[in-house]
Curated annotation (Swiss-Prot):
Organism of provenance: Corynebacterium urealyticum (strain ATCC 43042 / DSM 7109)
GO MF term (any one): pyridoxal phosphate binding
Record's protein name: Serine hydroxymethyltransferase
NCBIfam families attached to this UniProt entry: PRK00011.1 (NF000586)
Enzyme class: transferase
Known role: Catalyzes the reversible interconversion of serine and glycine with tetrahydrofolate (THF) serving as the one-carbon carrier. This reaction serves as the major source of one-carbon groups required for the biosynthesis of purines, thymidylate, methionine, and other important biomolecules. Also exhibits THF-independent aldolase activity toward beta-hydroxyamino acids, producing glycine and aldehydes, via a retro-aldol mechanism.
Superkingdom of origin organism: Bacteria
Family (UniProt): Belongs to the SHMT family.
Amino acid sequence: MSDSPQTIQHNVPLAELDPDVARAIDGELARQRNTLEMIASENFVPRAVLQAQGSVLTNKYAEGYPGRRYYGGCEHVDVIEDLARDRAKQVFGAEFANVQPHAGAQANAAVLMALASPRDKILGLSLAHGGHLTHGMHLNFSGKLYEAIAYEVDPETMRIDMDKVREQALKEKPTVIIAGWSAYPRHQDFAAFRSIADEVGAKLWVDMAHFAGLVAAGLHPSPVPHADVVSTTVHKTLGGPRSGLILAKQEWAKKLNSAVFPGQQGGPLMHAVAAKAVAMKVAQTEEFRDRQARTLEGAKILAERLSAADTKGAGVEVLTGGTDVHLVLADLRHSELDGQQAEDLLHEVGITVNRNAVPFDPRPPMVTSGLRIGTPALASRGLDTAAFTEVADVIGTALAQGKNADVEALRARVSKVAEDFPLYEGLEDWKLV
């Protein structure tokens, strides 16, 4: 039987059907291989995650939950979603898990829908001091639908002062208190947040999107025993697909499930749910724990190098003097470089980071006076102590030399590290299997 036009089109490989997209994907693979990725919110997923996410599951609609779908033919995706939920609960010691959120922002929107009503007060870390858009930023849904109040870091220590958080909570009586962050290099005291929430009659929500992988490995205090609800992305330190996850006490299960579907979303992306299931299996391995340990070690090596005499002399400071997590915040307020210039300089060298506001930043958000530098992707790439030390020295030297940096020499050092730790060996351009 001859192929119909539709059958032919459905079996043509990407490079033949759409060479423009294929070339762009090839270019991105080359960029990831040949440069060093140090954006704190990015990571490299295992090839098995790529395979799951690029599977035929992208074809399947599955509104509802396992055993309670609004579509037929869900017997296989039910198995996958159950695996993802059960594994997530095992990894984090949680009573309840919802693996359907398309992204962290959708997870956070569902959490607020479940815990609060429109115009209720919510108390979270200021975006300008390391919080996230979804914690009450005025242009975000969280700042439009709810009365958002922000706590800030102490101007001297650059750390969260729990006594001041308590004072604000007692004064404002929020419905929800939010812990967690997007750019804060220290542990938070979840027990203290719980105590404050209980004192003022608030629910406690922790957004652990950035440090979930460290929690899973037992290398960071877990918010799960303290919080009513915990949300996270799966793609940062966890190293899974770009997507969201909600964990909670069982008492919140019904409200949270309803808030995700039909509250925030229709059908889940089952290819992403499958990739989450794979990521949760990986998170239970010794190799994963080793990777998280190297992530922390790399961040501490970087913080130490950026505290050296040459960088300090160039006006570079490490916010809070160090780090407890996977990222370092470099304060450039006294440097000749602003955040944009520093990001561009490191990009020329072959290291990808992002400019980031520091607390009390005098510069506009598109320029900033800081850099946020993370180590998860390099740990996933296999970097060891010596390699992290070399990368930290490249960054420290570049920031110390500033506009006089020897870009060519520094780029050669970066290229050597990239060659020594190859990425996705055997992956042929855009082909995922």
